[in-house]
Amino acid sequence: MEVERAKGSRFRDPGVRLWHFATEILVRCPRCDGRALVAVHPDHRDGHTYAVGWLTAPHRLTCPGCAHVAEWGPRRWQSGAGDAYFTRGGPLVVPELGGPDDPYFGLPLWLRRPCCGRVLWAYNVPHLELLEAYVAAAQRERPTPAGSQTLLERLPAWMKAAGNRAEVLAAIRELRDGERP
């Protein structure tokens, strides 16, 4: 995803949602503690119109370090199980996005670190780059039409606070630099 930056230190919110970054999630491997990837299963057919279709699709965890592979499949929804996605085969539980663990296997995200007394996290490098561009900007433009559902509009106040900018940017850069080979 290309982050659009206007002249100077102005940032224009591209209007993406968190689920845009949930197709490839970097996690800690449960076997070797190395970097692993959680992604939509390669055998899964394309054709979903809505994000919830991708969120409830089968996912696979793969670790290039130790060759560990694990499969995740959607669970049938039952009362009290959270949000449901209704399909021809019956309702499915929609994985809950957000937080420093992946929504499928519950593994710690690879891109996470303490920051400002909280935990800074990102699903992948493009997610981290979007956060960096937003936090670094002196001026931030909302998308049109403005809504409250974009990833950036829903960031916690501590990440948006000007007083935390230097610490948040340092943490983001540390995470990003740790990703370089």
Task: Go through each PLM region and give its residues.
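Conserved aromatic-histidine-acidic binding/catalytic patches
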Residues: 17-20, 51-54, 116-119, 123, ...
